[in-house]
């Protein structure tokens, strides 16, 4: 899967689960997760954990 498709899927899940605006997400976060080989589901779970714990 290419990065753009991966990013669209991850963003759609975040918007659906949090109601946040897409522009609220840091792009560097997604690049790092993609480069680390995470699936978009793993990246979303990690993002939400970091968001709700205050790390973001």
Label each PLM-derived region with a short phrase.
Residues 1-56:
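C-terminal alpha-helical interaction appendages
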């Amino acid at each position: 899967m290419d990065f753009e498709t991966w990013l669209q899927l991850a963003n759609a899940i975040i918007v659906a689960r949090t109601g946040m605006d897409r522009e609220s997400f840091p792009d560097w976060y997604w690049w790092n997760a993609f480069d680390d080989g995470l699936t978009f589901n793993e990246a979303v779970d990690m993002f939400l954990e970091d968001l709700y714990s205050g790390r973001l």
